[in-house]
Regions:
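Nucleotide-activated chemistry modules centered on ATP-dependent adenylation/adenylyltransferase
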Residues: 2, 26, 131-140, 144-181, ...
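RNA-binding accessory domains that recognize and position tRNA/RNA substrates
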Residues: 1-180, 194-214, 218-221, 225-236, ...
Length: 394
């Protein structure tokens, strides 16, 4: 399997080396968790994985789950000679090419061969056309082919591929500081958590139990979405922190109607700040997006931020709901996120879309941040086992 990097390939030597070490460790833990064989050789520009023929597609799909990876391809490793490349392309054409247009996409890593990338495209295309099955009329389309035969020629080996699995990109997991992820079990928060994981930050998942204001399936759906997130980083000791927030939420509801959601979100990030201090996290991540709810207007987000000294990261800030929902479907967290939870009872009769920090401070319970500290200290730790997405199979 040939594994390609993105941002990782442009890092300085020292930083790149540390990140590649993280990527290799993450990849090996994924292979072990999924019971897949593979020898992982992490190189400066590419990672090569040697595996069994029957496991090659599953290993390539696993490689495409590794943060920092742009794409992965089941590949045939051969000698970097014209004859070997022609033979490999001919074999691939005879076995798989069943009609439509094709192209040979060739590239070389160094100028140490007696041919250019253009030469490979030319003689490789001839080999594909000559070996095509009898019922096929080969046709070249370099712009939008039905079939792409990829050839990557490196100094010591050449690699021929027909299939490419797109990866998440980003940075290797664990190369950034951890963040506290506030997970409600809704559509947005697991997607936001995944996005910071994709950029290298481990997460500390925190769920606030709303007591009488939560529904019977509220916690269950939050746990299931976190299990799906854990699938992408199974080498970690995953915990789900359940914060008993029912009494505090009830007191906030009694104290305010208009502005209630703002006061609650300020309490929420204060809880997250306390937990971040305990876990060495450098910030908080939420699934908020500008204007999606009354508490998420630009002005109201600034009022929420004023309740904590930590940065509040919002990866979905400018995303539309349809885009977020599609991302949740790709992660296989959408169905769990849409289980009825019955927590809309907390919503006020009149929404506050343009709040005032002074007014919220005046109306919110004066002990709300003390409650946040106590509730965070009482958080229950629940071990999490990773769960595979519905479309996964070895």
């Amino acid at each position: 399997v040939l594994v390609r990097y993105g941002d990782l390939s442009i890092k300085s030597d020292d930083v790149g080396r540390r990140m590649r070490d993280k990527l290799g460790g993450h990849f090996r833990s994924l292979l072990e968790h999924r019971n897949l064989p593979g020898e992982v050789d992490v190189g400066h520009a590419r990672t090569i994985v040697e595996t069994d023929p029957e496991s090659v597609e599953a290993v390539a799909r696993t490689a495409a789950d590794v943060f920092g990876v742009v794409s992965a391809s089941p590949t045939l490793a051969i000698e970097p000679t014209q004859e070997s490349i022609e033979d490999a392309l001919a074999d691939a054409s005879a076995a798989y090419y069943d009609g439509g247009t094709f192209a040979v996409d060739a590239r070389r890593s160094r100028d140490v061969h007696p041919f250019t990338s253009e030469d490979v495209g030319r003689f490789g295309g001839d080999a594909v056309a000559a070996a095509a099955p009898a019922h096929v009329e080969p046709s070249v389309d370099l712009d939008d082919p039905d079939w792409t035969f990829e050839v990557e020629v490196r100094p010591d080996r050449a690699y021929v591929s027909l299939e490419r699995f797109e990866g998440p990109g980003g940075l290797p997991y664990g190369t950034q500081a951890p963040l506290v992820a506030l997970v409600s079990g809704g559509i947005d928060s697991p997607v936001a958590a995944y996005e910071v994981m994709r950029r290298g930050s481990p997460i500390v998942p925190v769920y606030l139990d709303l007591g009488d204001y939560g529904g019977p399936d509220h916690e269950a759906r939050a746990v299931e979405t976190v299990r799906k997130l854990a699938w992408h980083a199974p080498g970690e000791d995953w915990e789900f922190l359940r914060v008993p927030a029912g009494d505090s939420v009830a007191a906030i509801a009694d104290a305010l109607d208009r502005g209630r959601m703002l006061a609650f979100r300020r309490y929420m990030v204060s809880v997250a700040e306390e937990i971040a201090s305990e876990h060495g996290a450098a910030g908080i991540v939420t699934g908020e997006a500008i204007g999606q709810k009354s508490s998420q207007t630009v002005r109201n987000l600034s009022i929420t931020d004023a309740a904590t000294e930590l940065p509040v990261h919002r990866p979905l800030l400018t995303r539309d709901k349809d885009t977020i929902s599609n991302m949740a479907r790709e992660l296989d967290t959408f169905s769990e996120s849409t289980i009825p939870a019955g927590c809309n009872r907390f919503a006020p009769a009149s929404a506050e879309t343009g709040g005032s920090l002074d007014r919220i401070r005046e109306k919110e319970p004066e002990d709300v941040f003390r409650w946040a500290e106590a509730d965070a200290a009482a958080a229950e730790r629940i071990a999490i086992e990773p769960a595979a997405p519905a479309d996964w199979s070895n």
